A protein has these predicted regions:
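A boundary/linker detector
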Residues: 1-35, 39, 52-77, 123-130
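Surface-exposed loop/turn and secondary-structure junction residues enriched for glycine/proline
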Residues: 30-31, 36, 44, 87-90, ...
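Short, flexible, mixed-charge glycine/proline-rich loop motifs
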Residues: 35-44, 99-103
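Short beta-strand-alpha-helix junction that forms the catalytic/metal-binding core
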Residues: 48, 91-113
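Histidine-centered catalytic micro-motifs used for acid/base chemistry in nuclease
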Residues: 48-50, 79-89
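Short Cys/His-centered divalent metal-binding micro-motifs
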Residues: 53-57, 103-128
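Hydrophobic "anchor" residues on beta-strands that sit immediately upstream
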Residues: 78-79, 107
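Activation segment
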Residues: 88-91, 117-119
Length: 130
């Protein structure tokens, strides 16, 4: 279980410095992230957790990044590890499977659901009157 948020802890301090320099991509290229991501992908089923929650449930089989396509008809998308608590908002949880309440901080998703999570349509502040 993670401890309460501490911006002076590692990796939070390092990630905040990267964000300030607009170089957050360096975190995702780091050995720390690659090892963490690899461990998660090896230990969890390779299915989109968000597709499974849809009604009706959709089982989206995913390909692990190191797997080659089995043939030219292999259309499985590559699995993505998604942070539920965005790294920009909770850098202390960047390398944690769970948050301080024991809730999952990372999930395996397909590229479509990952895009949807990062580009959610914002709810308008005022009611649309068209």
């Amino acid at each position: 279980m993670a401890l309460p948020y501490d911006p002076d802890s590692w990796p939070a301090n390092w990630i905040l410095q990267l964000i300030a320099k607009d170089r957050l991509k360096e975190f995702y290229l780091s050995t720390h992230w690659k090892r963490f991501r690899l461990r998660l992908l090896k230990s969890r089923p390779c299915r989109c957790q968000l597709c499974e929650q849809k009604e009706p449930a959709v089982l989206t089989p995913l390909r692990k990044p190191w797997e080659k396509k089995s043939d030219s008809n292999d259309r499985r998308p590559v699995a993505i590890v998604h942070h539920i608590n965005e790294v920009r908002h909770r850098p202390d949880l960047a390398l944690s499977e769970y948050d301080e309440h024991g809730e999952p901080n990372t999930i395996i998703v397909c590229p479509g659901c990952h895009w949807d999570e990062h580009h959610k349509r914002k709810i308008p502040v005022t009611e649309e009157r068209w």
